[in-house]
Amino acid sequence: MSSIRLYNTLTRKKELFEPLEPNKVKMYVCGPTVYNYIHIGNARAAIVFDTIRRYLEFRGYEVKYVSNFTDVDDKLIKAARELGEDVPTIAERFIQAYFEDITALGCKKADVHPRVTENIDTIIEFIQTLIDRGYAYEVDGDVYYRTRKFKEYGKLSHQSIDELKAGARIEVGEKKEDPLDFALWKAAKEGEICWDSPWGKGRPGWHIECSAMARKYLGDTIDIHAGGQDLTFPHHENEIAQSEALTGKPFAKYWLHNGYLNINNEKMSKSLGNFVLVHDIIQQIDPQVLRFFMLSVHYRHPINYSEELLESAKKGLERLKTSYFNLKHRLQSSTNLTDDDDQWLARIQEQHEAFIREMDDDFNTANGIAVLFELSKQANLYLLEKNTSERVIHAFLREFEQLLDVLGITLQEEELLDEEIEALIQKRNEARKNRNFALADQIRDELKAKNIILEDTPQGTRWKRG
């Protein structure tokens, strides 16, 4: 039985995770509208839900992960007009850019990345069924969802229909029955990209695409539906209304939403000029640092993006990597066994269990990272031992590799290779033997500048990364 507990936006409480089918998870994550490069707010969602997927797989679940592309909508049509290009060309360019960005950030591709334009027939069929059942109606080529007919409308965002009605209004030119009704199909305007339908030429509304594609690739009911907090209403609320009206079944068992991202304590917006694109920022900083930073705060909490906090994340990640590479280096001088192996192996197991405990509690990556720092501290203490064993070193290395892989952090080799360091130490030893202390000091300083610390012992010169 699962020990994972997750916070469900639908019920506003933590619940024991019990997928519909044992050991299998069907997960749908709302993807980007591909009219531009993704910004760091999009990146947070991509990183968070990639990590949750990785953790579920680490715990033995088989995850089918679907994340869509909105490759036709008002923003794309506007961009096409401004750039003098067609919508498919712009969409394709930014889909490829999206893959480049998320790959740099350590995110795995989804099992399926459906596009709206490749699923028009599925969407039309879905809309027609809603019309047949009285949940939708057509007016002059537009099709609207009859919101009041769905009695549970507002259950995800915890708003009553009357509260919503008070803030709703009908725009000029709209022919809706009710201000709360929303578009499922939009009649084509002159010069716009469009498709044939039973209601004339047009294109899908935003909300219907996710309902149709989630059902096509994952079935009537899915385990986890996820996205940014800003999508809770109206997007996810409308998805529930559409899908449950069609199937008569719950659309998703668990709803997960990541918190907002602020820039220097201000909301990110183009008008404030603080809009940060992933494409730009990863030219300036290591993408792994950006990922580590995003995971340093619980996914449901707001996160504040600043240079100071990024620098702190960079130093934290360097601490973990330094411990890891110092362990790798010590393997060369370790023995088969030492007397206190079992004691150290027990400490490593404690950290393994602590990591699982924290991540089982609503995927708390912030506390999971704290466990990794404790593992690093234990590793550093072990490296102070006069004699170290291969068995313990390997156990530490495996633990670092396994837990960092859950967080999507790769352990790449340092720029200065062990062989290069050993060659410089050999050169320094010869210089000392020949009483060329100036050269010996120069080599020590050169290594120190590369964060390599030397320790001269009766058994020879040892080194470690600082």
UniProtKB/Swiss-Prot annotation:
Superkingdom of source: Bacteria
Cofactor binding note from Swiss-Prot or TrEMBL: Binds 1 zinc ion per subunit.
Cofactors, names only: Zn(2+)
InterPro entries hit by this protein: Cys-tRNA-ligase, Cys-tRNA-synt_Ia_DALR, Cys-tRNA/MSH_ligase, CysS_C, Rossmann-like_a/b/a_fold, tRNA-synt_1_cat_dom, tRNAsynth_Ia_anticodon-bd
A single GO cellular-component term on record: cytosol
Keyword Protein biosynthesis carried by entry: yes
Binding sites annotated in the UniProt record for ATP: K270
GO MF term set: ATP binding; cysteine-tRNA ligase activity; zinc ion binding
Keywords attached to this entry: Aminoacyl-tRNA synthetase, ATP-binding, Cytoplasm, Ligase, Metal-binding, Nucleotide-binding, Phosphoprotein, Protein biosynthesis, Zinc
Span of the annotated motif 'HIGH' region: 32-42
In-chain residues carrying the UniProt-annotated modification Phosphoserine: S271
Enzyme Commission number(s) of this protein: 6.1.1.16
Motif 'KMSKS' region, chain ranges: 267-271
Compartments reported by the entry: Cytoplasm
CDD domains, per the entry: CysRS_core (cd00672)
One biological process term in Gene Ontology: cysteinyl-tRNA aminoacylation
Annotated positions binding Zn(2+): C30, C210, H235, E239
Pfam families: CysS_C (PF23493), DALR_2 (PF09190), tRNA-synt_1e (PF01406)
Transmembrane feature ranges: none
Record's subunit section: Monomer.
Family: Belongs to the class-I aminoacyl-tRNA synthetase family.
Name of the protein described by the UniProt record: Cysteine--tRNA ligase
